[in-house]
Structures are given as structure tokens and as C-alpha cells.
Amino acid sequence: MKYVGSKNRLSKELVPIIQSYITKETKGYLEPFVGGANMIDKIKHHNKIGCDIHKQLIALLKYVQNLDNELPKTISEEEYNNVKKNKDEYEDWYVGLVGFCATFGAKYFGGYARGFKEDKITMRDIPSESIRNIEKQRKNLQNIKFMCGNFLDLPKELIKNYVIYQK
């Protein structure tokens, strides 16, 4: 998923380093600031936890995990503005989808995303591109436990012998 501060472009270098710390004794892998899940989705371990305090982000990631749940093909500027002004009237996952996928620069509700293709004439459908990125990531999110909250509130005994990656 496109996300401000994403480490996706660095994952080819970082994942092997992180993976090298995961041994047979490792009980799990934790990302306390999971963001767009662009690192955790590439780590190999049977017990992965992605934590974040952003309620709509975690709701979106959980929604996307369910392969039966459908996502819209795109998000219009009118829909973006309606959701931005009336967040309480929509489900959290949908607010997260609109806030991240239809926003310029993946900055949560930082302005509707617009852009042009390389010909500088044809408009791009950036929300549609972002939603397709999430669809591609979907299968890699299946075995991750997403939790909304401050990772400091996790019981220390729960995360003992975990590899923890903090961005």
C-alpha cells in the first residue's frame, strides 16, 4: 500500500537483514508501526504482529485480509470530499481506504490525488492505481495479526523472544 514513510523501496535490502535475526528460537516478529505493511508482508515467520495506533489503517488492513471483501475500483473526488467531511458516517476500513488511496502523496486526507501520465495530457486515476496496489498485496497479508493500539501497551511476556522492527 502507498503510505507516507513506506520502506517498500528499501525492502529488498532490509528484509534479508531482518530475516537473518529470525531463528528457530524466535517466537514471532513484531512491527510496532506497521503503516502500509510493506515490510511485514515480506517477512517469513508463522507468527507476525503488525501494530499501529491509526484505527482506520488497521481496520483497512483487516478488511483487505478477507479475500471475500471487495474494494471499489476507484474513488471520485466527490466521494473523497464526502468521506473527509463525514468520517463518522462511514465504516473505519472505508475511511482508511479513501484517506490513503485517494490522497495526494499517500498523506492521509492531504488533498485529492491528481496526476498526469507521461504524455502530460492524459489524467491518471491515482485512487484506482492505489487500490490495485492493495489488491496485489492482499495475499501477502493473510497470516499477519493486525492490532490497533500502542505497542508499549502489549504485555512484555507476549513479545519476549520476538524480532522487532521499528522504522
State what each model feature region is.
Residues K24, I43-H45, K139-L141, I159:
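Short, well-ordered coil/turn elements that cap or connect secondary structure elements
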Residues Q19-Y21, L154-Y162:
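Short amphipathic alpha-helix with an adjacent loop that forms part of the alpha/beta core around
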Residues M1, K27, E78, A106, ...:
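Intrinsically disordered, low-complexity segments enriched in small/polar residues
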Residues H46-C148, L152-D153:
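Class I S-adenosyl-L-methionine-dependent methyltransferase module
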Residues M1-Y29, F33-V34, N38-I43, G96:
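S-adenosyl-L-methionine
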Residues L14, Y29-I43, G50-K55, C101-F104, ...:
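Conserved proline-anchored active-site loop of SAM-dependent methyltransferases
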